[in-house]
Design a protein with these regions (language model features):
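AAA+ P-loop NTPase catalytic core and its hallmark functional loops
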Residues: 2-197
């Protein structure tokens, strides 16, 4: 189990900056970034410190309160895609999967809709438009999630992607928690959650 230290806000900020800088280096080497967990009493500025450093680094700051959302909020909305081809069956055939929203546009450009379709998922609204620079994703109340949400979060933490979308290169995930030894309604973390190995 990971060792827990008590730090003040400035120390937390410096530690976060170290992890963020390290994650940029890891991403540059094609390695997965490391998530960091901050545990503290409510009102001790855990989320504020993360937002402050995100603003200083000009990262997109996204905060998800995990006790208030469901797994579908991580997945995104279902969309229907259709397979279309230009010059079908010829050497220069070009085929794409497009959503029903742009199908007419591609047909007008000379593509033919085939009789193939599939269900896909759009990016969740909270990540759309944030592909241009790294994201500092704060998962608040990490130890207050349901088991299903905990599994979804572990995938996101391990892979920096979930189902149909991924975080931009160089992004960092920060988890915030309330202490499990206090009078809060929290879930005990298992060893995989505590160490992120």
């Amino acid at each position: 189990m990971a060792h827990k230290n008590e730090l003040n806000s400035l120390q937390v900020k410096n530690l976060l900056r170290y992890f963020i800088d390290n994650n940029v280096k890891l991403a540059g080497k094609g390695k997965m970034p490391i998530a960091i967990e901050i545990e503290g009493m409510p009102g001790t500025a855990k989320t504020s410190v993360v937002k402050q450093i995100g603003d200083e680094l000009q990262y997109h700051f996204v905060r998800l309160n995990l006790s208030e959302i469901e797994v579908c909020d991580l997945v995104g909305l279902p969309t229907y895609e259709y397979k279309i081809c230009k010059n079908a069956g010829k050497k220069d055939e070009e085929c794409l999967w497009v959503s029903d929203k742009v199908l007419g546009h591609y047909i007008a450009m000379g593509f033919t809709a085939l009789n193939e379709h599939r269900t896909s998922y759009s990016k969740p609204s909270w990540i759309q438009g944030k592909e241009d620079r790294p994201v500092l994703l704060t998962l608040d109340d990490y130890n207050r999630v349901t088991p299903m949400m905990a599994n979804a979060c572990m995938t996101l933490i391990d892979e920096q992607k979930y189902i149909s979308w991924g975080l931009p290169k160089g992004s960092t995930i920060v988890l915030t928690c309330n202490p499990s030894d206090q009078d809060f309604m929290v879930q005990q973390e298992d060893s995989a959650q505590a160490t992120f190995d």
